[in-house]
């Protein structure tokens, strides 16, 4: 696998993939909308506090590598960005909808168990059960062009092993262990889902405000 991203680049790509699926009417994203998505408090781990300059620096680097493109029109005053990370005409990385959903979820939240991935990808892809998630993960881990994810050693007291993407290079297991938080309950997962929905509604409102302002500018 040739793609290697910084943490901010991974967040940018993850956000663009997510919004392409969940809010297609607002996609491609303006720099403001993309920055808001990167700093979203729900469905992000770790939570970041990036400036527009931070995000633009990452976007410019990704454009140079043809992983992001500026889709704004000739007379447009606002740049709009879309990812070219996978499933492009000339790109090497081809992912199914399920694979894309899993990769997106990992780019946004890091290492996760198959059960967590199934819950958190409910708006990105459909899985019948956890076993189906595990099968897709195994396929990604054994990709013929090089592994895209890796299965991590099972932690003491945990029933499931976590998986992590390899788009930011090899995984430092000891670092991940330090960053591990307490397991989520079903109630906290529901709260996370509600927080995500509120954040997305705010983004849609911000995008509508942008459109109105552009009409009167």
UniProtKB/Swiss-Prot annotation:
Record InterPro entries: DUF480 (IPR007432), WH-like_DNA-bd_sf (IPR036388), WH_DNA-bd_sf (IPR036390)
Gene3D superfamilies associated with the record: Winged helix-like DNA-binding domain superfamily/Winged helix DNA-binding domain
Disulfide bonds: none
Lineage: superkingdom: Bacteria
UniProt family annotation: Belongs to the UPF0502 family.
Protein known as: UPF0502 protein VIBHAR_05349
Lineage of source species: Bacteria, Pseudomonadati, Pseudomonadota, Gammaproteobacteria, Vibrionales
